[in-house]
Amino acid sequence: DLKLSRGLGDVYKRQILDSVGNTTAATGKGFAIASAALTSLALFAAYVTFTGIEGINIFKAPVLAMLFIGGMVPVVFSALAMNAVGKAAMEMVYEVRRQFKEIPGIMKGKAKPEYDKCVDISTKASLKEMMLPGILAIGTPVVITLIPILVGIENQEVAEMLGGYMAGVTVSGVLWAIFQNNAGGAWDNAKKSFEAGVEINGEMTYKGSEAHKASVT
């Protein structure tokens, strides 16, 4: 970031390049969502072919329950992932504050920060905090398959239940991805609009205002 690195020249003129990068990233996310949706459909078709089921009857209570569970998994996964990001970020904030207190020359450019500790925190925290979302994504279909088999439900019904789960995950996951992509882009653009200056109720609002703080948080 030019502001953090104190780059030469007018920083705000170079924000045009940042806008281009954001546009490219948004376009790339759209392609990623589309490819993930097609991959999910292909896996679902392969699953139906492999199991030999002719259809999924959602009038059956277990299948309908798995459909709802599948719809909830992407939402819960996203919540856990965002919570993990927040926890990792706070650990980084505590480390940066510690370095500011213990190494006074950092702010004046006379002392070198301990970059390795920040990198170590980001790596360890990201791996540790993402364990639960990963277990949720991998373990849920395994549990859905094993428990009915242990109870004594026929394999064909178990296959339909897992198919209902996969259908719920696919539909909910694609819609949730589109929603988050658009919401994230809107929030980012709102923040940048305030940095450039936005007229609200006849008054110009800039960076540092309450409206800008609200858009950031």
Where does each model-flagged region fall?
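Single conserved hydrophobic/aromatic residue that forms the stacking wall/gate
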Residues: 1-8, 12
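Extended, low-charge hydrophobic alpha-helical regions
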Residues: 10, 32, 36-59, 63-217
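Interfacial and helix-entry/exit segments of alpha-helical transmembrane bundles
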Residues: 13-29
